Amino acid sequence: HEHSSDESSESSKPCCDLCTCTKSIPPQCHCNDMRLNSCHSACKSCICALSEPAQCFCVDTTDFCYKSCHNNAEKD
């Protein structure tokens, strides 16, 4: 059980490569990643464009950034 498939972890594990935060306290952070067909599992407000495949963005406001999606796969 050491290998986890990339496709399941990409869509389900909350992660973000393009995260922006305000300088307020607490910070207001937004993930600007575009994902195909769905948002990550922790996303409460997911907006998808009506395209094939759908381009989805998570519009949640959090006070932190999720771990980077691409670094996840290499260092575990």
UniProtKB/Swiss-Prot annotation:
Signal peptide: none annotated. The record marks K23, S24 as: Reactive bond for trypsin. The keyword Disulfide bond applies. PROSITE patterns: BOWMAN_BIRK (PS00281). One of its GO terms (molecular function) is serine-type endopeptidase inhibitor activity. SMART domains: BowB. InterPro entries: Bowman-Birk_prot_inh, Prot_inh_BBI. Keywords: Disulfide bond, Protease inhibitor, Serine protease inhibitor. The record marks L50, S51 as: Reactive bond for chymotrypsin. This is Bowman-Birk type proteinase inhibitor DE-4. Pfam families: Bowman-Birk_leg. Belongs to the Bowman-Birk serine protease inhibitor family. Disulfide bonds join C15-C69, C16-C31, C19-C65, C21-C29, C39-C46, C43-C58, C48-C56. One of its GO terms (cellular component) is extracellular region. It comes from Macrotyloma axillare.
